[in-house]
Amino acid sequence: MRLLGALIGLAVGVLGAAIVLTAYRRWVQPWQHRWGATDEEVWAAMPGDELVPAAASTTRAITIAAAPEDVWPWLVQLGYGRAGWYSYDWIDNDGRASADHVVPELQDLQIGDQILMGPGMGPAVRAMEPNRYLVAGDREGGSWCLALNPAAGGTRLVSRWRVRWPLTPATVFWVLLSDPGAFVMERRMLKGIKARVEGAAVGSAA
């Protein structure tokens, strides 16, 4: 009887997990993957797309009440060991607070420079056009583009990740496990950039 009860419990657990996973993949994940982005932004080609063809992608965006040239300095200084990620610093910046101002000595970002995600790891800058876009990544793992598009009322900051994973049970499990966390961190980053840029604009106008 104990064995039967254990098997029934296991079956119920597996079924419950399958239902939750299916619901997440069908309704939650699509919303996460395009948070804040319009249909046009989701389907538009962006710099860096060619680095990783036939890849899974996310496109997220936010409107910032400032000109692209006022947003750009905050992008070129981001990264671990630099200005931080403007996100949850206790997770991605060793607890050090992300910069709340533009740091002049961090503005000279060049092609080939590494943007660290953590100690010793991170993609290299592959392309950039000041005040327009910044692309980092490689052909093996993935690419990341931050684009600044002028819009009514300011700038649309659009972030696109493209990743090609080998299709194995381990990678599928890892993607499903890390996907919600990546969304939470990136949304916080986009909101953090917006708050800093708009706060700086208010401060300079005062």
At which residue positions do the language-model features occur?
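Hydrophobic ligand-binding cavity/cleft-lining segments
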Residues: 9, 18-110, 203-206
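Short, hydrophobic/aromatic-rich segments at coil-to-beta transitions
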Residues: 112, 127-136
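Hydrophobic pocket/interface hotspot
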Residues: 71-74, 125, 157-159, 193
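Intrinsic-disorder/low-complexity, polar/charged segments enriched in Ser/Thr/Lys/Arg/Asp/Glu/Gln
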Residues: 7, 17, 55-61, 133, ...
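Glycine-centered loop/turn motifs
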Residues: 104-121, 126
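Membrane-penetrating hydrophobic segments
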Residues: 1-11
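A short, structured loop/turn motif at beta-sheet edges
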Residues: 65-69, 127-131, 147-156, 197-202
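Beta-strand/loop substructures that line and gate deep hydrophobic ligand-binding cavities in soluble
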Residues: 38-42, 138-195
